[in-house]
Every structure is written in structure tokens, then in C-alpha cells.
């Protein structure tokens, strides 16, 4: 591995040479493990609350703080990848994430668990360092394929996290899930340290100047603002659903355990499978049409969940599964299209553009988790469905609103 541990230049001498498959697999797996850490708790909320002696509303703050920490970490930590060796940042974050997960598994109280959840969210942003690292390492001729593979790993991490955590919590307890996750991240961190090259900093801007440039990009590019706002609104409904699903299934009329809640994560396969398909449509027809179709799918799916409450229990459950497949497909397709829009705005600021998009996305998720737990506590499941449907309608309205097209930002980026 010594031949790939040298400081890496973003402009490789052999633009058609392929990145070694084991390294691509390592990056993809590590991104999946990192992002999975912020979703493990969602199917386990029912057993976590019972095990630690916390109310549904209190334990519902676990995913809220995790998502908030993730958004905060993207905003405050992700820009450092342009200033310092990205390999060192990734490995340090992996160590911090492993420790935060271990602390969560050993938390003696709900207060300690909430602190651990915030730390997990902050450190899990190493996934957002791995994706631009993959783009930098990949030769231009294969960059799209490499980044697509890493994004597939990230999406599968989201998918499998809920399935695995629901199963482990049901059979070994929720604390075991956090400890196993800690060990997996630690192993990935060692592999990344040994397998990745060092990266040359691409700027000498101070930390304050890096953060300040985010505001400049936000003010300058209307397409960035629209993409971020629409994805944030869509994420409100996405997170409101996933952060309350386990509690809803745990109660009447279903009385199901963590395994059932985690199994709903299999519906996320639709999102992972939709990623390359959505990308192809965005390339041929423009990302704009993908964003509109994706948000429309989410609206239809969430509205159908409300109608499903009128059906018998078994039919209700089947309709809920089908609607989960549809809305997850819509959300993930819209995200891929928004990334296509954002990455095409300014090639020299893609990392910071990506940070802004994902800050908005995970701010929406944190808001959705908070509002979802309040809606469930005060209005029941139907209130959660109304919240998710309304936020998705808001996302569609943002995408339908005509956009200004400044000279530095061709309107063609969003046509279709």
C-alpha cells in the first residue's frame, strides 16, 4: 500500500487509470458504516425507552439530537477537508465516532444517552468527507462511477442500519447494537488509515474564511438555495416518519417489536436502486423533472398512509409497507437530482456546496424528528402523516416556483 500513501494530487497523471477496486469497496463500506450510525436508534426507541426508564417524548429526542449533530458537523467540520489532510480528518472522526457509540451503549441515563447521540451525529460526518475524497482520488474518466458506488454504499448503510439494529435490539438488546457498531467503525478507521493516501490541502484560507465562503455561495446561487430548501422540506417528512414508526408499531393496533420496525428499512432498497436510475434520467432529461416527480411520489405515499388508517389492521400494515417503498424512492431520487444540480453550479466549490445541501437536509431531518415526536404525542399517527404530507407539498412548491438565472448560474442546470 506504500505506493498510494503519498500526498495525493487532485489532478492525477493517468486520467484513465482505474482506482483499485479494494479501495473503492473500503470507501463505500466506510461511508455506509458512518451514516448508519445516525439511524441505528430509530427502530430501537421503544425498547430503549423501556430499558433506560425514559418517556416516549424524552427518548424521541435521541434521533433529534443525532440529526442535529450531523447537520452541525457538516457545517462546522466538513469545510476542513479543503484546508487539511482529508485522510487524517477521516481517521480522527472514525476514532471519535467509535468512542461516541461505545459511550452510547454504556449510557447510564437518558441525559448521558442524549449527549452520546449528539457526539455520534458530529463524528458521523466522516461520511461527508469520504465522498469528496473518493471524487478526488478517482481519475476524471471514472469519477462518476466511483462516486456513484460510494453513494450506493452510503444509501445501503441507511437501509441496513434499521434492519440490523431492529434485529440486534430484539435479540441482544439495544446496548449491544451500539457496542457492535463501535467495533465496526473502529475496524474501518484502521483500514482507512492503512489504505488511503494523504491529501494535499487545496486552500490556505483560515477556518473563519472557509465558513464565511459558505454564506457567499448561498447568497450568490439561487439554484443552491432552491435545492437546499426543497430537500430540507422533504427531509422533514422523511424523518418524522422514521423517528416515530417504531413507537407507532409498538402500540395499538399493531403491538409489534423492534424487528418489525427495523424490517421496514428493507423498503429503503427502493431508494438505493433508484439512485443510478434517477441519475440517468437527470442526465438525459435534466434534474428538474426528477425533483418534481420525486416530491410528487412522496406526497402520494404519505397521503395514502393517512387513508390506510381506515383499513383493517393487516391491510393497513401492507399499505404502510407499500407507501414506505414509494416515498423512500421519491426522497432518494430527489436527493440524487439535487446533487446533480448543486455539483453543476461551481466545480471549484463542490465540497462546500455539498456541505450546504446536506446541512439543509439534516436540519430538515432534525426538525422532522422533533416535530414528529410532538405530533405523535399530541395528535397520534395521523398527525405525523399530515406533517409529512404537508412538508412534501412544500418541497414540490419550491421546485415548481420559477427560478432566477444569474449569469454565473445557467438555467440549463435545472431544466427538464
Give the location of each predicted region.
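Cytoplasmic helix-loop-helix junction between adjacent transmembrane helices
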Residues: 116-154
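Conserved MFS/SLC helix-loop-helix module at the cytosolic interface between two early adjacent transmembrane helices
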Residues: 72-110
Amino acid at each position: 500500500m506504500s505506493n498510494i500513501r503519498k500526498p495525493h494530487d487532485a489532478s492525477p497523471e493517468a486520467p484513465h487509470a482505474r482506482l483499485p477496486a479494494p479501495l473503492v469497496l473500503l470507501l463505500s463500506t466506510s461511508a455506509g458504516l458512518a451514516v448508519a450510525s445516525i439511524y441505528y436508534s430509530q427502530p430501537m426507541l421503544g425498547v430503549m425507552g423501556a430499558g433506560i426508564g425514559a418517556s416516549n417524548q424524552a427518548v424521541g429526542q435521541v434521533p433529534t439530537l443525532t440529526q442535529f449533530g450531523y447537520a452541525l458537523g457538516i457545517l462546522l467540520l466538513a469545510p476542513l477537508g479543503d484546508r487539511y489532510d482529508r485522510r487524517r480528518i477521516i481517521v480522527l472522526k472514525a476514532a471519535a465516532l467509535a468512542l461516541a457509540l461505545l459511550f452510547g451503549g454504556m449510557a447510564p441515563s437518558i441525559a448521558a444517552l442524549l449527549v452520546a447521540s449528539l457526539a455520534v451525529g458530529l463524528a458521523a460526518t466522516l461520511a461527508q468527507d469520504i465522498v469528496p475524497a473518493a471524487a478526488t482520488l478517482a481519475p476524471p474518466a471514472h469519477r462518476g462511477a466511483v462516486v456513484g458506488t460510494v453513494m450506493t454504499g452510503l444509501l445501503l448503510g441507511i437501509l441496513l442500519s434499521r434492519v440490523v439494529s431492529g434485529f440486534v435490539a430484539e435479540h441482544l438488546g439495544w446496548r449491544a447494537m451500539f457496542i457492535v457498531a463501535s467495533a465496526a467503525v473502529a475496524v474501518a478507521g484502521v483500514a482507512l488509515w492503512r489504505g488511503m493516501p494523504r491529501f494535499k490541502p487545496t486552500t490556505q484560507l483560515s477556518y473563519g474564511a472557509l465558513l464565511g465562503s459558505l454564506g457567499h455561495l448561498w447568497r450568490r446561487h439561487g439554484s443552491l438555495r432552491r435545492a437546499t430548501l426543497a430537500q430540507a422540506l422533504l427531509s422533514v417528512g422523511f424523518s418524522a416518519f422514521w423517528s416515530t414508526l417504531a413507537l407507532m408499531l409498538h402500540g395499538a393496533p399493531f403491538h409489534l417489536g423492534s424487528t418489525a420496525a427495523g424490517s421496514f428499512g428493507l423498503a429503503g432498497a427502493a431508494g438505493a436502486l433508484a439512485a443510478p436510475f434517477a441519475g440517468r434520467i437527470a442526465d438525459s432529461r435534466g434534474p428538474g423533472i426528477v425533483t418534481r416527480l420525486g416530491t410528487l411520489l412522496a406526497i402520494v405515499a404519505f397521503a395514502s398512509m393517512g387513508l390506510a388508517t381506515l383499513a383493517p389492521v393487516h391491510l393497513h400494515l401492507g399499505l404502510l409497507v407499500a407507501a414506505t417503498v414509494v416515498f423512500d424512492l421519491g426522497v432518494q431520487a430527489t436527493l440524487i437530482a439535487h446533487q446533480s444540480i448543486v455539483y453543476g453550479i461551481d466545480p471549484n466549490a463542490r465540497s462546500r456546496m455539498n456541505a450546504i445541501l446536506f446541512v439543509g437536509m439534516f436540519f430538515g431531518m432534525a426538525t422532522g424528528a422533533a416535530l414528529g415526536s410532538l405530533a405523535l404525542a399530541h395528535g397520534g399517527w395521523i398527525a405525523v402523516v399530515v406533517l409529512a404530507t404537508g412538508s412534501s407539498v412544500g418541497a414540490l412548491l419550491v421546485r415548481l416556483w420559477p427560478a432566477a438565472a444569474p449569469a454565473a448560474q445557467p438555467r440549463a442546470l435545472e431544466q427538464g
